[in-house]
Structure formats: C-alpha cells, structure tokens
C-alpha cells in the first residue's frame, strides 16, 4: 500500500483512485499492483483516455476497456459513459483480467489475454517487467 501511495503522488493520482486498485484486487483476488501496472501501460492513469483501434473498436478509460465488452457490461447496467468513472473502469478491468486468469492461469499469457490476442504479443511480458520494478522499489 505504501508503494501505491508514493506512485499516486508521483503520477498525481488521488488516494481514492489508488484505493480502487486495492479494492478491485481484493474483490477479484488479483494482486492490485498488476492492475496498477496495466493502468499505467494502458492509459498512464488517464480516466478520460480514448484509443481508437484499427478494427473500429474503442478503448475507454484508465484500464482501456475495449468497446467489444459493452454489450456484456450492459447486462449489468453499465453504459459506455460509466467507464469514464475510474472506480467502475478499474473494477471492469479487474473483472476482465480475472476472466483471463481463469482461462490462462495467473501467468504472462493471462495478462496478455487482457490485451486481446496472445500470439506474437509481448504485452504480458511488458506488464510483468513493470511489476518487477514495482516490487524492487518496495524493498
């Protein structure tokens, strides 16, 4: 937790936002530091980030939730606009990551799954490299 507070100050995140990583991690039984590293890679913690993909889909918010998931999220009462709320977005990201972990294990492939395709994709490796730095800085 101490590390998340230090990073929050460095990246100008609110304490409340860093708490969302802790809360979502606890709820989905995921290391919150993994969620934090994904958010850093995906949006540099920008809750208003929007990325347009070549396939026509859009990634939204802190965790860059892809618009292909909107149909399923609507079943739970969430609309696209809700994904600009950091808490909702971080929980949605944790939910998606948990599904990937259930399919591929808590592994590099599990993290890569969060980004979409697994073949020829270094996403998981890059997130794990960042995670290693996070843990080294905590020592």
Tell me what each language-model feature is.
Residues 14-139:
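Catalytic glycan-binding domains that act on GlcNAc-containing polysaccharides
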């Amino acid at each position: 937790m101490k590390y998340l507070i230090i990073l929050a100050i460095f990246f100008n995140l609110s304490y409340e936002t860093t708490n969302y990583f802790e809360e979502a991690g606890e709820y989905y039984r995921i290391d919150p530091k993994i969620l934090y590293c994904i958010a850093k890679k995906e949006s540099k913690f920008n809750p208003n980030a929007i990325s347009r993909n070549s396939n026509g889909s859009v990634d939204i918010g802190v965790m860059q939730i892809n618009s292909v998931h909107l149909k399923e999220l609507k079943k739970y009462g969430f609309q696209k606009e809700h994904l600009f709320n950091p808490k909702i977005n971080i929980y949605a990201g944790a939910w998606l990551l948990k599904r990937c972990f259930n399919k591929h294990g808590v592994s590099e492939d599990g993290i890569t799954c969060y980004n979409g395709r697994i073949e020829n994709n270094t996403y998981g490796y890059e997130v794990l490299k960042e995670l290693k730095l996070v843990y080294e800085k905590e020592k």
